[in-house]
Amino acid sequence: MAAPWWRAAFFGIGRCRGFSTSAFLSRRTPPLGPMPNEDIDVSNLERLEKYRSFERYRRRAEQEARAPHWWRTYREHFVKETDPKDKIDIGLPPPRVSRTQKLLERKHFLRELRANVEEERAARLRTASIPLEAVRAEWERTCGPYHKQRLAEYYGLYRDLFHGATFVPWVPLHVAYAVGEEDLIPVYHGNEVTPTEASRAPEVTYEADKDSLWTLLFINLDGHLLEPDAEYVHWLLTNIPSNRVAEGQETCPYLPPFPARGSGFHRFAFLLFKQDKPINFSEDTRPSPCYQLAQRTFRTFDFYKRHQEAMTPAGLAFFQCRWDDSVTHTFHQLLDMREPVFEFVRPPPYHPKQKRFPHEQPLRYLDRYRDSHEPTYGIY
């Protein structure tokens, strides 16, 4: 038998809120600024100015979207973004280039390109070839450092290495691992390199002045087995004269990457620091060979804090690495220790409290609360 109408009305009013109540509560707090379209007179829509084209409407919509508003967007409510102006820039100052000079160079290049008959004919016949090396060099010289900075922020390198401080890698750092006699595995900015490919020290090149000094650091951000806030130093070269890496002081010998099995991808970073003068790195010196992980415990932030008066971060390159068979050899032969193996243990599935009378539930409902693994389905 259906419930009387007066009972439904009585209990319905007690459990829900009407439109009038919601409207009244919303009026209790006035808006913090003008509401959208508040300045439009809706009483006479025929007199309003029309856009007459979609392009005008699009420009107006983009202008309104870029304008500051008093209300918060969905991203501002749920994503807490730090202001880039609040971050400390610890890198080198940007090179000063006149904008007028840039425009003149672009005009001169376009003029030469338009006057080149062979290039025009090759483009028309679809046989033109693009010099990728020149394109990459131009990218490294213009917007490349900013792209590298954005990638490093995306992977959390600045957050974990320098506690939020940032820098623009103005000096292009080229790192490549030799595989075989002719093949090279380059290190870009987030690509994957296996531990087998990185078993030997890489070839590092960069452009530098004749009388300058540099420091090269190679670390693992995610591989420490005991301290979550520490890193392992795999290679440290100090007081490098100009770009002659082989003549630098090997403060810490090279150790191949050893990401533990089951720990996923690890971030390995090459940091290039520019020195203002020769620095004494006796506190950071490790014995050679160094196969004790306790001696390779490292903190980049403390290292930079000790020598920040005499060196500045200038270059960056990093890759991702995960376990392969060569890691077992590194643990057993070089580090002389048992290999740690990690496994993700999933939490047990949650089941609500069992009902005595599971109304409209399938027969498999009882399998959730049985002690044995024998299924109920198919027995009866």
Swiss-Prot record:
InterPro entries: PEBP, PEBP-like_sf, PEBP_euk
Main location: mitochondrion
Localization per record: Mitochondrion
Database matches in SUPFAM superfamilies: PEBP-like
Presence of keyword Coiled coil: yes
GO cellular component: cytosol; mitochondrial inner membrane; mitochondrial large ribosomal subunit; mitochondrial ribosome; mitochondrion
UniProt cross-references to Pfam families, sorted A to Z: PBP (PF01161)
Chain coiled-coil ranges: 100-123
Key word Ribosomal protein present: yes
Keywords from the named record: Coiled coil, Mitochondrion, Ribonucleoprotein, Ribosomal protein, Transit peptide
An example Gene Ontology biological process: mitochondrial translation
CDD domains in the cross-refs: PEBP_euk
Transit peptide interval: 1-26
Family per record: Belongs to the phosphatidylethanolamine-binding protein family. Mitochondrion-specific ribosomal protein mL38 subfamily.
Subunit structure and binding partners: Component of the mitochondrial ribosome large subunit (39S) which comprises a 16S rRNA and about 50 distinct proteins.
Protein name (Swiss-Prot/TrEMBL): Large ribosomal subunit protein mL38
Organism the protein comes from: Mus musculus
Gene assigned in the entry: Mrpl38
